[in-house]
Amino acid sequence: VLRNDGYELACYTYANIGYGESGTAEIEADLALWKEEVVPILGEVDTLVFAQNSDIDDGTAAYYGDKIALLQKYGFAKFIGFCDEGSSWVSLNDGYLRQGRLMVTGSTVAHNSEWFTGIFDTANLLDPSRGDVPA
């Protein structure tokens, strides 16, 4: 139903593990479970959103090595990581797209409000009666 309404679905890993800190064997085991348990329900997806604020490489450079080869073997061509500097970015590489996303959470809104300047006014989002938001 969601796809019929124009939504594009993505993988967030099977077990919510950080692929940056994981070895290829652990990533492959996670992807095998995704393919076995989730793909029959959702269908194939080509977008991977890295869990745990993780990425398989630092910075915005092109990926290389065993991890990107493994992810591409499982059909992924779009990779979305987390930007902790407050600005999103997109990098189009040979055969895949890499993007850094800006996460909107209570913590980022409370402690990094400058990240959202020009997007929305963070002062209107947090309820002061709820107390401090942990960092």
Residue spans of the language-model regions?
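C-terminal active-site subregion of NodB/CE4 polysaccharide deacetylases
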Residues: 8, 21-135
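Active-site-proximal loop/turn and secondary-structure-junction residues that shape catalytic pockets
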Residues: 13-17, 54
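A structural motif
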Residues: 1-14
